[in-house]
A protein has these predicted regions:
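Catalytic machinery of carbohydrate-active enzymes
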Residues: 1-191
Length: 191
């Protein structure tokens, strides 16, 4: 079994780009083990993805990073991918022995998809457009136990607590459903 360690220590939207890479790895190497190093901002969200076997939290402080390095050394990963391009991730990866290491070029004005395709080529893996749909590989929190109906309008993740997304479902309404909803909302508020 091949073991992959992927660094994604930034925000949720950045992880969604990495989810494409992870889904491609999983499709090409279905028996693999994938561990994602996450930040406190995206840790809970990443845990909800079925395509990720383990999520490890990267915390602040030199001592915690040294403990993390020791923990990761024991795991013995075949491939390490620094997809966030952060110096701290690159530095941690330098202390880890592996057969193969890839550092993202995302900070060099290269398209994210070009970067992902390049990484997949380095791994001798193929890219499939179906890998772009990553949300179907997520375990959503059940809302069956709610006593009252409610509506949540959410326009930007900066409006709500940093870990908000781990508790909500993205329903992706069609234009017709959205217009119908707003008409219903207008009718109810005008009474």
């Amino acid at each position: 079994m091949n073991k992959y360690l992927i660094f994604r220590t930034d925000k949720i939207g950045d992880f969604l780009i990495s989810a494409i890479l992870i889904k491609s790895i999983r499709r090409n190497d279905p028996d693999s083990f994938i561990n994602v190093i996450a930040s406190k901002e995206n840790y809970n969200y990443i845990k909800s993805f079925k395509i990720v076997d383990k999520v490890t939290l990267l915390t602040k402080g030199i001592l915690s990073k040294l403990k993390l390095i020791n923990l990761l050394r024991k795991e013995k990963y075949n491939t390490i991918i620094v997809h966030d391009g952060k110096r701290r991730s690159i530095l941690i990866s330098l202390f880890l022995k592996t057969n193969f290491k890839i550092v993202s070029n995302a900070n060099l004005n290269i398209s994210y998809f070009s970067d992902i395709k390049k990484m997949l080529n380095l791994l001798n893996f193929s890219f499939d457009k179906a890998d772009l749909n990553t949300l179907n590989n997520r375990t959503y929190v059940s809302l069956d136990n709610l006593e009252n109906n409610y509506i949540l309008l959410h326009f930007d993740e900066k409006w709500i607590h940093k870990e908000y997304i781990s508790n909500y479902i993205n329903i992706e309404p069609s234009e017709k459903e959205l217009v119908s909803f707003f008409n219903l909302l207008v009718n109810k508020t005008n009474k």
